[in-house]
A protein has these predicted regions:
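Active-site helix of classical SDR
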Residues: 91, 127
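Substrate-binding pocket helix/loop in short-chain dehydrogenase/reductase
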Residues: 41, 66-68, 75-77
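Conserved NAD(P)H cofactor-binding loop of Rossmann-fold oxidoreductase domains
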Residues: 58-64
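Residue(s) in the substrate-gating loop at a strand-loop-helix junction
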Residues: 111
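Rossmann-fold cofactor-recognition segment
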Residues: 18-34
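Active-site loop-to-helix junction immediately N-terminal to the catalytic Tyr of the SDR YXXXK motif
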Residues: 71, 117-125, 137, 166
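Active-site-adjacent segment of SDR/Rossmann-fold oxidoreductases
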Residues: 116, 137-148
Length: 168
């Protein structure tokens, strides 16, 4: 949807114009948000909506495309924070709200390099393998204990700024 409040507001307006339910905007920087922000977000969503019908993990950063031996810790950590840790923290915080909804859906965005590693995709590929693992573990844990569906989706090549950066 976008990494700016301006883009979120455009989506908000489109939902309203289409006659959808009253939306809400809860900006959060996944690269730096402390754990407590995720609990705060869940509390705000719970107060506003009472439940959560779906959660799409689509936020992701590419990081540096280079050999792992040349990847800096800072670059590695940033990719893992946004692509893996934020998904874990947000999922954990939102699970009670998802479980309060009938047939809620939890969807992770994957990548081909998260299913078969490729040279020079380093931290991004590893983060997508971790995303697949998180999805599989959650799907198994919730299979017979919850109505929450857990899946991942590999959308294939999409025309995004991240893809243009990967393939200049």
């Amino acid at each position: 949807l976008g990494r700016t409040v301006e883009k979120l507001e455009a989506v908000y307006d489109a939902i309203e114009a289409a006659g959808g339910a009253q939306p809400a905007i809860f900006p959060m920087d996944l690269a730096s948000a402390p754990e407590s922000d995720y609990a705060g977000l869940a509390g705000a969503v719970g107060e506003t909506f009472g439940r959560l019908d779906g959660l799409l993990h689509n936020a992701s950063v590419l990081g540096e495309r280079r050999p792992i031996e040349n990847t800096t810790w800072k670059a590695w950590e940033q990719v893992m924070q946004v692509n893996v840790n934020a998904a874990f923290l947000l999922t954990r915080a939102m699970l009670p709200l998802l479980q309060a909804a009938p047939r809620a859906s939890l969807l992770f965005t994957s990548s081909g390099v998260g299913r078969k590693g490729r040279a020079y995709w380093g931290a991004y590929a590893v983060s997508k393998f971790a995303t697949e693992g998180l999805m599989q573990v959650l799907a198994d844990e919730l299979e017979n204990t919850s109505e929450v569906r857990v899946n991942s989706l590999n959308p294939g090549a999409t025309n995004t700024a991240m893809r243009r950066a990967a393939y200049p």
